[in-house]
Amino acid sequence: MTSSSINATSSREPLIHIPNKPSLSIDPLARADRSVHLSPSFFQPGLSSISSENDDAEQRIHEATRSFNQFGHQFYESIRELSESTSAYERLKANALRRKLENTFGNDSGAATSSSSSSVFERQSDFSAFAPYKNSHFDSTQSLFQPTTSFNDRLEQIKSDFIAEHQKSMSSFSGFNTPTTALGAAFQGMQVKKSAFAPVLLRENLDTRRPGGHLISDILNRDPLPQSRNLNLNMARNVPIRLIHSTSNFDIASSSSGDSGHQDHESIVVEDADMDSPTSPCVKRSAMNFDLRDEPLTVNVESVSSTSDLPSSVSSSVNSFVYQNFDPLEFKRKIDELTASACLAVMPDANGQVDPMAIKTQLDAIKKQMEEHQTHMAEASQRLHVDSSLEDSNCEPSPSSSYDASEPSVKRLHHCTHPNCGKVYTKSSHLKAHFRTHTGEKPYECSWDGCDWRFARSDELTRHYRKHTGDRPFKCSQCSRAFSRSDHLSLHMKRHF
């Protein structure tokens, strides 16, 4: 059958032999027949040798796979982990270990691989199924996976020698501290500083006054806020400010000429050095001797209604109020302590249970703190009073008043005599100012050249005259702003609080 096939092929056309491929020839008519005709010499000469080589390679693959499952997997995993380590020191150790293993296995491979089957396998290993197990660092896979006792002992000895060698200081390497390799001296320090397993540094100087939330470690701490705190005594506090009513004579000037030379006799007001306005010497002297660290700041605040029938100093005195000497930092510290203690009380213990007595203790502490806060509020509300003696001294004298100074201090009632008006006043000056709203009388005329404005009350004339002079006697103690009216200062002060 072989001779007939050869004759049939040669009868069609001689075969074309490919150069450098003596065992392979192609039929030129193969494209037309859609099939390739190979020369019989390609199959016959080397069938026995190739089959034997393939059988030997397959057997060695199975043996190497069995050896790899016993030992090689763990070994290469350790080498790969050391090679992929982010630490330069660990990579240095892995490279040194790999070089030692290469030298050792290279010497063993020359003596172990002497058979013809091994040489054939080395020639065809790149095209075999053994490629996943092939490591280019080693000359022979047979020497690598030879399951002998001597090899295991040798490997353990190499590992122990390597560990003992690298337990020494980094400076023991030759040339490690020379100027050309000085960069390696920082490896060990870099490993300690940037390692994920470096010891955690406790933040001793924790800023507990930050506006954001606290860390969980801060809340779980028994003393989240340090008791000792260095406060700057030279810094003025913003909250402990006493606001009292005014005894100003600007708003109740008795003169009908509208003279702007009246001096402001208000109680202590902190003057602004950048602004120059008429102020009494006693006020300036009090401002210079004022110490924010010893006493709360006193500021005049008035709230005058433009539609009131009474003088502004009288109608606004009911809005005067007083702030206690209250430290907001201390109050915030107590609130933070209560918050941290409450969080600890509601947290379960190791057994998952919550102590009801701890919760009750924290509730009692919160209740006590609320009572103290309400006490401060009650003391502040008690100071919301009207000083009648100051009001009497600020009232205008009334020529037609029926009040007798020789009589005991019994307040008389002054009734409005205008038809259909039943208002009653305790001071005749108030009644007189009110009665002008019925008659339309405006006895106070502006003395500024070219100004024809007239007013029924002297305080209204004083305010109007400040528009001409630009005088702003009411200054803010917190900033450089100044105002011509006390009620404007009162509105401005609310922005600071």
From Swiss-Prot:
GO terms for molecular function: DNA-binding transcription factor activity, RNA polymerase II-specific; RNA polymerase II cis-regulatory region sequence-specific DNA binding; zinc ion binding. SMART domains: ZnF_C2H2. Disruption phenotype: RNAi-mediated knockown leads to increased cell death, perhaps by apoptosis, in the germline and uterus of hermaphrodites. Lipid contents in the intestine increase. RNAi-mediated knockdown causes reduced ability of dietary restriction to extend lifespan. Abolishes lifespan extension completely on an eat-2 mutant background, independent of whether knockdown is ubiquitous, or targeted only to the intestine. Keywords: Cytoplasm, DNA-binding, Metal-binding, Nucleus, Repeat, Transcription, Transcription regulation, Ubl conjugation, Zinc, Zinc-finger. It comes from the Eukaryota. Residues 371-407 are annotated as: Disordered. Induction: Induced by treatment with high levels of paraquat, a chemical causing production of reactive oxygen species (ROS), but not by other exogenous stressors, such as heat shock or osmotic stress. Residues 397-407 have a biased composition (Low complexity). It holds the Pfam family zf-C2H2. It is found in: Nucleus; Cytoplasm. Its main location: nucleus. Expressed in intestine, hypodermis and a few neurons. Residues 371-388 have a biased composition (Basic and acidic residues). Ubiquitinated; probably preferentially monoubiquitinated by wwp-1. GO terms for cellular component: chromatin; cytoplasm; nucleus. GO terms for biological process: apoptotic cell clearance; apoptotic process; determination of adult lifespan; lipid metabolic process; regulation of transcription by RNA polymerase II; xenobiotic metabolic process. A zinc finger (C2H2-type) spans 414-438, 444-468, 474-496. The keyword Cytoplasm applies. Belongs to the krueppel C2H2-type zinc-finger protein family. Interacts with E3 ubiquitin-protein ligase wwp-1 (via WW domains). Transcription factor which modulates genes involved in lipid metabolism and the phase I detoxification pathway, including cytochrome P450 oxidases. Required for diet restriction- and mitochondrial dysfunction-mediated lifespan extension, perhaps acting in a ubiquitination-dependent manner. Involved in the response to oxidative stress. Plays a role in cell death. This is Kruppel-like factor 1.
